[in-house]
Regions:
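Conserved alpha-helical scaffold segments that buttress catalytic/binding sites
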Residues: 2-285
């Protein structure tokens, strides 16, 4: 049984039974390779969301007009990636089993793997749309196969060649870029090519998992993240891209890599909250 959370994201106050979208938080950052703190992202987004309006002038939609249940954060074992991923996957399976849309709040990007496992088990021929500063395609990081630096490589092992569509990538090892050129639909640096990719996915009528690493944003907009990379996209470019992706059959999604304590101004958390609001409104049917 999934119980209501004490503190919810603004406007996400529906019951589990009546909701079409379910938020679930994964406060995990144990494989962070540079600056930790993403485990505090989900709770910070909830707390600071009350500085937002529920209404989006970008989409002329309001969170009060859609049904979202916030199930809160999972209790995860910080010392075991396998155990944490298993718990996240079970929660995603429970949400999917009830016919709801699972929207995961990270946490570091490794948590996406658990959600993809659950969603791919329900939706064959799954495609993944990936916004990020980093390719995340290493086969291992310092010998670890389960790392935020390897998450899309592990996802590739699930969905296969041509099923991962990557945008905004501007950092990684040479081998990652070479792997991407052979095995993924790779669009470095910007969102160029996104509209064509979306047209193709709509024509194929395939299910899509949508993962947003917030470090796709430029650090001038979003400095509060574990591995900031100069040369990112703007906030408005990201919002336009989210609305474009929402035209496909999105069956699961996540927003990850906010490390709120790394930005004392609070701007990064405010930005993450606004991204989540826009994503919720874009995917709500």
């Amino acid at each position: 049984m999934i119980l209501p959370n004490i503190e919810t994201f603004i406007g996400c106050e529906s019951s589990f039974e009546e909701a079409s979208i379910v938020l679930y938080g994964a406060p995990f950052d144990s494989t962070t390779s540079f600056r930790p703190g993403a485990r505090f992202g989900p709770s910070a987004m909830r707390h600071e969301s009350f500085g937002l309006e529920t209404y989006s002038p970008y989409q002329d939609k309001d969170l009060m007009d859609i049904s979202v249940f916030d199930s809160g954060d999972l209790e995860l074992c910080f010392g075991s990636s396998e155990m944490a991923l298993s718990d996240i996957e079970k929660r995603a399976e429970e949400i999917l089993g009830a016919g709801k849309f699972p929207l995961l709040l990270g946490g570091e990007h490794l948590v996406t793997l658990a959600a993809v496992r659950a969603v791919a088990a329900k939706y064959p021929n799954l495609h993944i749309i990936h916004f990020d500063a980093h390719a995340d395609l290493r086969d291992d990081y310092l010998g670890a196969k389960l790392s935020h630096a390897c998450v899309l490589r592990r996802c590739h092992e699930i969905v296969g060649d041509g099923h991962i569509h990557q945008f905004c990538i501007r950092s990684g090892e040479r081998e990652e870029f070479q792997f991407a050129s052979r095995h993924t639909d790779f669009h470095p640096f910007t969102f160029e090519g996104l509209e064509e990719t979306i047209r193709e996915l709509k024509e194929k009528q395939v299910p899509v998992y949508f993962t947003i690493d917030l470090d796709c944003l430029d650090p001038s907009v979003f400095p509060g993240t574990g591995t900031p990379e100069a040369g990112g996209v703007s906030f408005l470019e990201l919002l336009k891209a989210i609305r474009t992706v929402s035209q496909t059959n999105v069956v699961g999604a996540d927003v990850n890599e906010l490390a709120p304590m790394l930005d004392a101004s609070g701007v990064s958390t405010a930005t993450a909250c606004k991204v989540l609001r826009e994503l919720l409104l874009a995917i709500a049917k």
